[in-house]
A protein has these predicted regions:
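Conserved ABC transporter NBD signature motif
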Residues: 62-73
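Short coil-to-helix segment of the ABC ATPase nucleotide-binding domain corresponding to the Q-loop/switch region
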Residues: 100-109
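The feature captures the beta-strand-to-loop junction immediately N-terminal to the Walker
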Residues: 39-41
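Conserved ABC ATPase signature
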Residues: 140-144, 148-149
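Conserved signature/switch motifs of ABC ATPase nucleotide-binding domains
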Residues: 84, 139, 160-161
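Helix-to-loop junction immediately C-terminal to a conserved catalytic motif
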Residues: 54
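ABC ATPase NBD coupling module
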Residues: 71-88
Length: 167
C-alpha cells in the first residue's frame, strides 16, 4: 500500500499570551485505503492536525507531502485545487451555507471542478438519495435536523470522489 500523506517533523505552535506548541515534530505516513482514528483529550491537537491535513492551516515547521509532491504553502491556488479534488472534509459542525438548500450545498462543492451545473446536480441528487435525503433536497439547513445536516455534510464530502476523507 502506498503512502498518500507523509508528515515529516510537523510542528504547530500558536502565539497567544505565550507560545503554545500543540504538535511537536510529528512524523507519520498515511497509506491509501486505510482508516485512521485520532483520539485524545480536548486540546491535544486533533483538530489542529485535521486542519493541517486538509490544507486549511499550515504547520509552523516540517514537511507535508500528498502523493510524492511536497506541499508549498505559498501556492494557495494549487492547494485549493488539491483540497477540492482529493480531500473530502466532514466538519464537527456541519458548516452548511444557510441560504442554500441541501442540494445546493452539495453541488456547489462539485461545481468548481465539474463546471457543469446539470451534471453536478445529478451527482448531488444521487448522493443525497444514498444518505437517505432524497425527500429533503430542497430544504434549507434551518429546516433539517442535526442528523440530516450531518448527512448533507457527508454527501458534500463525497461529491468529488476524494482520495481521503477527514472527519
Amino acid at each position: 500500500m502506498s503512502n498518500f500523506i507523509k508528515l515529516s517533523n510537523i510542528s504547530k505552535s500558536f502565539t497567544r499570551q505565550k507560545n503554545l506548541k500543540v504538535l511537536k515534530k510529528l512524523t507519520y505516513d498515511f497509506k491509501l485505503g486505510k482508516i485512521y482514528s485520532l483520539m485524545g483529550p480536548s486540546g491535544s491537537g486533533k483538530s489542529t492536525l485535521l486542519n493541517l491535513l486538509s490544507l486549511i492551516d499550515r504547520p509552523s515547521s516540517g514537511i507535508m507531502k500528498y502523493g510524492n509532491k511536497q506541499i508549498d504553502y505559498k501556492n494557495s491556488n494549487y492547494n485549493d485545487v488539491l483540497r477540492a479534488n482529493k480531500i473530502g472534509i466532514i466538519y464537527q459542525q456541519d458548516n452548511l451555507l444557510p441560504d442554500f438548500t441541501a442540494l445546493e450545498n452539495v453541488y456547489l462543492a462539485n461545481l468548481a471542478i465539474e463546471k457543469n451545473k446539470e451534471i453536478s446536480e445529478i451527482k448531488s441528487k444521487k448522493l443525497l438519495k444514498k444518505v437517505g435525503l432524497s425527500n429533503r433536497i430542497y430544504h434549507y439547513p434551518s429546516e433539517l435536523s442535526g442528523g440530516e445536516k450531518q448527512r448533507v455534510s457527508i454527501a458534500r464530502a463525497l461529491i468529488n470522489d476524494p482520495q481521503v476523507i477527514l472527519a
